[in-house]
Amino acid sequence: MKKLLFLLLIVAACTPQNDQQKEIKGWEKQAQKVTIIRDNFGVPHIYGKTDADVVFGLMYAQCEDDFNRVEVNYINSMGRMAEVQGESSLFIDLRMQMYIDPVEVKKEYEQSPEWLKRLMDAYADGINYFLYTHPEVKPKLLTRFDPWM
């Protein structure tokens, strides 16, 4: 019985890591399809074979420029500013939660057409890949971005 329990624990411990490795390989594969060229003013020009590739590159470049703003916009739209800024932001959170219901947003994502899901996935993946390639960046709250957010 102890051997079976030990085996189950090993399998359980390995599964998320395999999923994470698969996700990282997916990001790396998509990143290879994107070219970001910054001009003399630092403006990113993003090239990719598909719209999703360009969206992935856009979010990666935006995070390079100002990850803080990307994260704060997400936190605000999710009605979670008080978790970062404290009690003074409770009213802002309550107001946002009146307009945006995470359960409804997840449902809308699931019901979206495939072409739109690819864009939303690329949007989140570009941010997540940025965080993966820049471990020195410490998010205020969100360590993973989902496409429905």
Predicted regions and their residues:
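Bacterial Sec-dependent signal peptides at the C-terminal "C-region" and cleavage site
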Residues: A12-I24
